[in-house]
Design a protein with these regions (language model features):
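Gly-Asp-aromatic-enriched flexible segments
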Residues: 1-88
Length: 88
């Protein structure tokens, strides 16, 4: 598991990002992302595998002081998380 945490000072109401499998993901590889607002789980993305098309994930983070993104990979899963946007 990998994670990144950011202080956002209660300035944002939502986050959006895109998820796709990386080109060298293994056949059985999967992954997903969990979004935490002040250490409370607010969104879990669908599981992404080798044949998954791009998906967009949106999470409500209204009133959060801290934002954490946690990446979970299994069996050679490799994901690209892109187009991350915070919305006021």
């Amino acid at each position: 598991n990998y994670s990144a945490e950011y202080r956002i000072y209660k300035n944002y109401s939502s986050i959006t990002f895109d998820l796709v499998p990386y080109k060298n993901i293994s056949t059985d590889g999967t992954g997903y992302v969990q979004v935490y607002a002040d250490d409370v789980l607010v969104q879990t993305s669908p599981v992404v595998g080798q044949k998954t098309d791009q998906i967009t994930v949106t999470a409500d983070i209204t009133g959060a002081d801290y934002l954490k993104l946690e990446l979970h990979l299994k069996d050679g899963g490799v994901l690209i998380l892109s187009n991350v946007q915070l919305w006021p």
